[in-house]
């Protein structure tokens, strides 16, 4: 079969929050089984069964448990706190790990996956949280069914990321997640999906399943998986979650993905009618392994490691090893060892997630070229006959011998209902770099988060990661952070030239010491308009842009294009003047001061600089040029072609009659973007597309101050100077306008060119300007590398049985405001606010005073915070739209009904749609509350984003069953 690449890995296993820490756990022979007492188990029932690994009569149980599974960051996923506490922690954990797997792959869900045929295949079995919530009917609400449904585990992920490929949960017990991997591969191979997320999740939240397994004699008395050992007496339960990102290998190679492993083949089968429903079946195990080998095109003798099911039962272990022997010994020489082991000896049996745990273990082993130790093996099970065979069990971390061909391994998972799965893995191909282009002297690292605390936490993670991975290349770190991470509102940009400097800069940020090259800000959701200002004469010097010329092909190509066009007009090559050999610098400097060369050189340099900024996605909303700079501005605005512009420039310093003749030969067009004329100081009109305008331009005065005033009046706040010196910045300061907005240079004489360029780019980024980061590095050979994943800001969301009173199912009708304070859920503060609104409503000037709008905003914050389930004094963001807050149609209907009841208004449903926020809704309500005699005054000011029409609730709220 066609090979499938594993390009991203995310995991949470006991003692390991990510793949790196999981490998450390495995490599260091760590057994994470521990006692836990913080789960709502039925301890009395557990103690009745002696085989359950409890400690005396204490309320604790042994297992491979995750920390703080009741904690979650709903804000990150735009889920309301109210709904979050009804969502199975397995769903919540899966969302986080899936996001981490995509970050590990360097994939941006919003731009690369949204609306695509991306499949989600997940394994899950346990329904413990549903059992907890079902214990008291009083706690049931509209979110229970969706929140605890196993199928929704996959569907919610697809919904939140807008993934439109297959989305399903597979339950084959212990083999669930490996079966999910198999079907994800099939979806890719058939073309049904172009990318898949596959894996599984398992949490132990109640005692019922443990009691049942104890009755079935499946649990080890000492709480240890002693796989292959003579003392094996069952397994210990464990928790975990793992997700891998899968892609066809050819596509991954084409896209430059970080390939971490390869799936060569996979197979799934069933025991059928055998010794018993839950009994292992040797012939079926052999069959599924042979099928996987056949699909992979691999001989049994090529497999050098197998991650086994290894559930530590005397019969099951011997059947599995004997099945492996029967298959893997075929064609194998005595000196061709095949190692076997089980991750269950480290973390317990994570049941539905056990297959993905084994697969991730093998992927990490292939990456490191080492095989972890198999724990708790003191005396081999006498029924396992591997003495004097190539089958071996590692008891220490050991090298995985390299071979001429890539290393190959197998992973098995056998469900206790008889569904078996086997996957063949191959190590990733080596990455080869052929970097011919001279590297930049500086680099730009971008980091962002949804909140300031998360940004601080992420910076801390980066520091630790950089120190733990000294071999990572700085360019690859910065590349991955830019193209492989979503860019949120709270941003940091750092300009550096070494990893040591990067670590120091991040430490400076943590302490609040914003040093040179360190920029942070909360990005605007609506970035300011950008004006490009093209510098005039007086800023020229030899070697301006030399670093850019040697390191940036787009800049170099633009300079060389101008040089070729100018050859018929200039005696000397422009390149010889701009970038002379050291021995020719004095002559070149003298020539550059001659008008015949000054103007063409400045034009070519600024045109190339513009092309470079444009290739990074930084494009102006308006352009303005000072003197000769206006020719560049007009060119990029489309007034004339590059060839015509250079023809004009080459003749501009000559006799006026000659220039006039040339000007009348040029083809002119109206500007395609806003162009400020420095002849008039206003927006250019149709005159700019005439020869006479450019003839007058030669001797006309430059209206710089007026031009800048025009830009300010048009709302421009970001100014990027396209020139070799920030001359216009100095002139603007003289106009006393420089403190209004952001002024950014492209270059500064005497400073490293990349340091200046990247500083300006970093400031644009933190301000919220969209950057084409792929374009930024398109000319370099970069590699995506593993970087820290998002630090979720978790809080506790858990339903404690017996603590919640029955919820009211309907809202009260219109009552007096004082009654509402006691008979509805409105707080005393809201009652006061409603009194103020009612008083203000009777005033003729209600719609004219901003404090009334403030009252409405406060009222809505209180109501929405209550409906969303916010804790304490937390209030929703007034500029965040309702769906970003996590509100759904049920919540919006509740809000609408409450507003109508409180304010005696008829509120149309669609007022809540199309990006509505608290501010826009308050404005609409404000308009409805205005007395008749002032309605006309305010009507013209109303936000026409919403068309007020009536929509029935039944037309809006639809639940598909």
Question: How would you describe each model-predicted region?
Answer:
Residues 1-437, 590, 611, 640-654, ...:
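Condensing-enzyme catalytic core of the thiolase-fold
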Residues 1-9, 41, 48, 54, ...:
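Flexible, low-complexity inter-domain linkers and amphipathic docking helices that mediate domain-domain
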Residues 10-12, 280-295, 408-530, 546, ...:
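Flexible catalytic loop/linker elements that gate and position reactive groups at enzyme active sites
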Residues 63-69, 669-692, 764:
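Short helix-loop capping/hinge segments that flank enzyme active sites or metal/cofactor-binding pockets
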Residues 177-180, 630, 889:
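Catalytic nucleophile loop
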Residues 449, 517-657, 718-731, 746-750, ...:
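FabD-like malonyl-/acyl-CoA
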Residues 497, 523, 562, 601-623, ...:
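Flexible, low-complexity segments
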């Amino acid at each position: 079969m066609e090979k499938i690449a594993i390009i991203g890995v995310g995991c949470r296993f006991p003692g390991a929050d990510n793949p790196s820490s999981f490998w450390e756990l495995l490599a260091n022979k760590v057994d994470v089984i521990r006692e836990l007492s913080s789960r709502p188990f039925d301890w009395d029932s557990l103690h009745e069964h002696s085989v359950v690994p409890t400690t005396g009569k204490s309320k604790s149980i042994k297992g491979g448990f995750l920390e703080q599974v009741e904690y979650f960051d709903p804000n990150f996923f735009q889920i309301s706190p109210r709904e979050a506490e009804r969502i199975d922690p397995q769903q919540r954990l899966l969302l986080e790990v899936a996001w981490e797997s995509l970050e590990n792959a360097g994939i941006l869900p919003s731009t690369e996956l949204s609306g695509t045929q991306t499949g989600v295949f997940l394994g899950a079995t346990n329904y413990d949280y549903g059992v907890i919530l079902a214990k008291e009917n009083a706690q049931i609400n509209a979110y229970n069914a969706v929140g605890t449904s196993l199928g929704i585990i996959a569907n919610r992920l697809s919904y939140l990321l807008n993934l439109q490929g297959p989305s399903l949960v597979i339950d084959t017990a212990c083999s669930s997640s490996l079966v999910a991997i198999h079907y994800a591969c099939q979806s890719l191979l058939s073309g049904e999906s172009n990318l898949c997320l596959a894996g599984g999740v398992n949490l132990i939240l109640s005692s019922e399943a443990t009691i049942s397994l104890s009755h079935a004699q499946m649990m080890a008395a000492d709480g240890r998986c002693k796989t292959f050992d003579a003392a094996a007496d069952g397994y210990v339960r464990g928790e975990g979650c793992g997700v891998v990102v899968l892609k066809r290998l050819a596509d991954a190679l084409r896209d430059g993905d970080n390939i971490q492993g390869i799936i060569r083949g996979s197979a799934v089968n069933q025991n059928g009618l055998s010794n018993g429903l839950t009994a292992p079946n040797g012939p079926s195990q052999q069959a599924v392994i042979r099928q996987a080998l056949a699909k992979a095109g691999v001989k049994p003798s090529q497999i050098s490691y197998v991650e086994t099911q290894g559930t530590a039962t005397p019969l099951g272990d011997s059947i599995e090893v004997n099945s492996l022997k029967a298959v893997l010994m075929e064609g194998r020489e005595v000196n061709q060892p095949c190692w076997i082991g089980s991750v269950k000896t480290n973390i317990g049996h994570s049941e539905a997630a056990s297959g993905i745990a084994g697969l991730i273990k093998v992927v990490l082993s292939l990456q490191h070229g080492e095989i972890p130790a198999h724990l708790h093996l003191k005396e081999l099970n006498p029924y396992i006959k591997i003495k004097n065979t190539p089958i071996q069990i590692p008891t220490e971390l050991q090298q995985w011998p390299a071979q001429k061909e890539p290393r190959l391994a197998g992973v098995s998972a056998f469900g206790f209902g008889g569904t078996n799965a086997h996957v063949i893995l191959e190590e990733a191909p080596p990455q080869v770099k052929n970097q011919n282009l001279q590297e930049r002297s500086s680099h730009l690292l971008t980091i962002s988060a949804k909140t300031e605390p998360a940004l601080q936490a992420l910076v801390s993670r980066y520091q630790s990661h950089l120190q733990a991975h000294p071999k990572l290349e700085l360019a690859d770190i910065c590349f991955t952070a830019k193209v492989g991470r979503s860019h949120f509102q709270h941003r940091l940009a750092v300009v550096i030239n070494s990893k040591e400097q990067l670590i120091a800069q991040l430490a400076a940020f943590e302490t609040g010491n914003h040093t040179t090259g360190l920029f942070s800000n909360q990005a605007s959701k609506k970035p300011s308009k950008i004006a490009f200002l093209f510098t005039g004469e007086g800023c020229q010097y030899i070697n301006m842009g030399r670093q850019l010329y040697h390191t940036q092909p787009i800049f170099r190509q633009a300079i060389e294009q101008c040089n070729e066009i100018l050859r018929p007009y200039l005696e000397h090559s422009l390149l010889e003047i701009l970038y002379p050999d050291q021995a020719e610098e004095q002559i070149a400097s003298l020539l550059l001061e001659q008008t015949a060369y000054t103007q063409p050189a400045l034009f070519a340099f600024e045109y190339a600089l513009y092309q470079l900024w444009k290739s990074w996605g930084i494009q102006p909303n308006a352009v303005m040029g000072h003197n000769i700079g206006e020719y560049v501005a007009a060119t990029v605005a489309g007034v004339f072609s590059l060839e015509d512009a250079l023809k004009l420039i080459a003749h501009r310093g000559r006799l006026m009659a000659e220039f006039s003749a040339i000007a009348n030969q040029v083809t002119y067009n109206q500007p395609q973007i806003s162009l400020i004329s420095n002849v008039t100081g206003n927006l250019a009109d149709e005159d700019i597309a005439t020869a006479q305008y450019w003839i007058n331009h030669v001797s006309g005065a430059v209206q710089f101050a007026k031009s800048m005033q025009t830009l300010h009046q048009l709302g421009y706040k970001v100014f990027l100077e396209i020139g070799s010196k920030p001359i216009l910045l100095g002139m603007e300061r003289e106009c006393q306008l420089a403190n209004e907005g952001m002024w950014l240079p492209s270059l500064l004489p005497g400073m490293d060119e990349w340091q200046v360029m990247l500083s300006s780019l970093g400031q644009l980024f933190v301000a919220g300007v969209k950057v084409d980061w792929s374009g930024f590095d398109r000319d370099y050979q970069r590699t995506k590398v593993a970087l820290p994943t998002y630090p979720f800001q978790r809080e506790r969301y858990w339903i404690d049985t017996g603590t919640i009173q029955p919820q009211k199912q309907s809202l009260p009708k219109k009552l007096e405001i004082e009654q509402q304070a006691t008979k509805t859920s409105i707080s005393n503060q809201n009652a006061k606010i409603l009194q103020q609104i009612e008083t203000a409503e009777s005033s003729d000037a209600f719609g004219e005073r901003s404090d009334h709008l403030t009252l409405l905003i406060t009222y809505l914050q209180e109501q929405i915070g209550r409906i969303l389930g916010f804790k304490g004094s937390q209030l929703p963001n007034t500029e965040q739209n309702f769906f970003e807050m996590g509100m759904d149609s049920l919540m919006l209907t509740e809000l609408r009904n409450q507003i109508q009841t409180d304010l005696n208004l008829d509120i149309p449903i669609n007022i809540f749609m199309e990006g509505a926020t608290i501010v826009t809704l308050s404005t609409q309500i404000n308009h409805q509350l205005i007395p008749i005699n002032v309605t006309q005054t305010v009507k013209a000011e109303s936000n026409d984003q919403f068309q007020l029409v009536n929509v029935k609730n039944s037309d809006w709220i639809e639940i598909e069953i």
